[in-house]
Amino acid sequence: MFMINLLLTIVPILLAVAFLTLVERKVLGYMQLRKGPNVVGPYGLLQPIADAVKLFTKEPLRPLTSSITMFIIAPILALTLALTMWTPLPMPHPLINMNLGVLFMLAMSSLAVYSILWSGWASNSKYALIGALRAVAQTISYEVTLAIILLSVLLLSGSFALPALITTQEHMWLIIPSWPLAMMWFISTLAETNRAPFDLTEGESELVSGFNVEYAGGPFALFFLAEYANIIMMNIFTTILFLGAFHNPLMPELYTINFALKATLLTISFLWVRASYPRFRYDQLMHLLWKNFLPLTLALCMWHVTMPIITAGIPPQT
């Protein structure tokens, strides 16, 4: 039964990822006043299938100088971790109900750094290595703020379990009292998933595509799938944390529709940001985090710790 549940989770994720690539190309197309893909199938709807067939039927070339084992393991690890992170997400019922779901998510996103590092190192190409080092530095840096923002939200929720956040937000979304945290969280998720304007790992002008420069065909497609699965997962996580949908046990479908709609809108906002903003310079990226976000999130975390203690002495206002 568990295997069926697992498949019923993984297959829709991969389908969502496939069509997200199409949505991205369409959104970017219309924002640049052009059509986007519209040849394969009606309105270009079969484009992702054509892309998948093309990528997976190509010969996976391996450079002679590369470390073969690590070169092949890296993309598989990237996709495995990207899919594993979906297990504790309540939609409205998680695949595995974990007591420490949030901690599990953080641990998995930290492990994702290794797949990037290995892919850059195993390629034995200077561009791939520079891209991987940039990606690792960026991902590790932004995880610091993500962890602190999560801690602040969990202080309001009072539990590490993700379903508890649904209960916390029955009366009000957490984005309303803690909107500065939500804004910083959104920007940090952009940086964490290596999306524009923080896609310095893939700086075409200087790095020829970054850590996946030596990958072609299937392994490249695995990295691609992992990246987009992470984007959708991060937006779902944002929805759970700050835009909690109302859950009525008698009508769980309503929760799922509400939840999916919010996550979709957030994902489209990722694409909107990509179409609107130019790429950051690397020092600006690091400056934004260490000089601006980190002090602010620490201050807000202290605020979230002290507020319940201060207000605990006030008698209930009935």
Curated annotation (Swiss-Prot):
It catalyses: a ubiquinone + NADH + 5 H(+)(in) = a ubiquinol + NAD(+) + 4 H(+)(out). GO terms for biological process: aerobic respiration. The chain crosses the membrane at residues 2-22, 68-88, 100-120, 146-166, 171-191, 222-242, 253-273, 294-314. It is found in: Mitochondrion inner membrane. InterPro entries: NADH_UbQ_OxRdtase_su1/FPO, NADH_UbQ_OxRdtase_su1_CS. Keywords: Electron transport, Membrane, Mitochondrion, Mitochondrion inner membrane, NAD, Respiratory chain, Translocase, Transmembrane, Transmembrane helix, Transport, Ubiquinone. Its EC number is 7.1.1.2. It is a multi-pass membrane protein. GO terms for molecular function: NADH dehydrogenase (ubiquinone) activity. GO terms for cellular component: mitochondrial inner membrane. The keyword Repeat does not apply. Core subunit of the mitochondrial membrane respiratory chain NADH dehydrogenase (Complex I) that is believed to belong to the minimal assembly required for catalysis. Complex I functions in the transfer of electrons from NADH to the respiratory chain. The immediate electron acceptor for the enzyme is believed to be ubiquinone. HAMAP family: NDH1_NuoH (MF_01350). Belongs to the complex I subunit 1 family. This is NADH-ubiquinone oxidoreductase chain 1. It comes from Coelops frithii (East Asian tailless leaf-nosed bat). The lineage of its organism: Eukaryota, Metazoa, Chordata, Craniata, Vertebrata.
